[in-house]
Amino acid sequence: MLERVAVLYNPLSDASIKLSRELTDWLIARGIKTRRGVSQEFRDQPQLVADCDLMIALGGDGTVLRAARLCFPHNIPVLPVALGHLSFMAEIGPEEVYSGCEQIMNGGGWFDERTLVRAQLWRNGQKLGQHTALNEVVISRSDISRIVNVHVTIDDSPLTTYHADGVIVATATGSTAYALAAGGPIVDPRSQALVLVPIAAHLTNIPSMVLHEDAVVTMQLRSRHHALLAVDGRENIDLIEGDEVVVRRSPQVCTFVRLRPSNQFYTQLVARLRRS
């Protein structure tokens, strides 16, 4: 039963703003306590989200990623609603949001648990930080004219040193995002496997790889010039030579609410790729 719902909208999208207002009024009229806001507001006041039963994310995949960041620490499920964008995370559009909410209010739908990855940044034996991603962790060049040298180890076994524009470690969910654009394989999102994808690699015969779910991937920067660490397209942390980023599956998951059968993924995938 839904008692409290958070509605996340994109402040740069008129369609998202309009639908968020209308949906909030619709939910309140049905006796559901509803909090409407943008990601910054919910980050600054996490108590607004912590006791919610559901977050509805209105926008593209960027909005869904922001919703995931807000919700997974509290185990709150997310209902993604795509607004005119090519989306691999959302299965319904604005025309279905009200019937979808009614379906959820009546006990329908199912929970789709997606794998997260955790990345730890180490420098000279000291852990500098820890970050969690739904899509991917990326080491990339910070200078457009230079490539980076990234030494990759999997489960303590050296793999190779990529001379590339960057290296991606993605989840199955992220396999249809940056990793796909870089030439990586598409992995069924129900899988817990990880994907290793070099970005425009030079002089290497090691292609993209699908790794087992408990793989531990260590990426060490071996370039004298700086590089950047990005987590789901955010953070952009400066890296220096010798820095290590250790990526493994997180014990936490991101939960989406789905209204269609799980076997619809491939049908939706083909439709989305045809539109891209």
UniProtKB/Swiss-Prot annotation:
Q: Name one GO cellular component term.
A: cytoplasm
Molecular function terms from GO: ATP binding; metal ion binding; NAD binding; NAD+ kinase activity
Q: Which cofactor does it need?
A: a divalent metal cation
Q: Which residues form the signal peptide?
A: none
Q: What is this protein called?
A: NAD kinase
- Report which gene this protein is encoded by: nadK
Q: Which keywords fit this entry according to its UniProt record?
A: ATP-binding, Cytoplasm, Kinase, NAD, NADP, Nucleotide-binding, Transferase
HAMAP family associated with the record: NAD_kinase
Location comes to: Cytoplasm
